[in-house]
Amino acid sequence: MNISLGNEQIVIRKVDRDTDLARELLAFVENFSWLEVREHTARALRDWSFEDWETPFAALAGDRIVGMATIAKTDYYPLPQICPWISTVFVTEVFRGRRISERLTAFAEDYARALGFHRTYIPSTHLGLYEKYGYRYESDIVNYAGDVDRLYSKDIG
């Protein structure tokens, strides 16, 4: 998926194991500002703990990663009946406000749809962000650390 932001083209790509892009995404995650998930996400990339169809996605401006998301069977919540999770949606501060998170989410939705899923779920603490992308608030959920987040869902066809 390509989008143009002024003079900069943003490309969303699926990240495959043992590729240059996977190594670049790991370096991006090891340095990003979302401290609460940085180590967990870096470990998942280092160990490549993605199974079957689970995968990360990267948003690139030129050859530089500026954002990411993942799609997985499970997330940091004791809710095994919910699947697939679009998670770890992150855009570097300089590139925020340019709808890159929307593009990452849409790319993950397209991927899920191609796999035969009809609904996707996003956990978040944000209010008003995912609603703009067609998600609806389902309920508050408690993660394994005991923190409360919001669960959003979207029918994707």
Pin down the residues of each PLM region.
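Short hydrophobic/aromatic beta-strand or adjacent loop that forms the aromatic wall/cage
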Residues: 54, 147-151
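Conserved active-site alpha-helix within GNAT-family acetyltransferase domains
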Residues: 114, 118, 124-148
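Conserved acetyl-CoA-binding loop-helix of GNAT-fold acetyltransferases
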Residues: 91, 97-110, 122
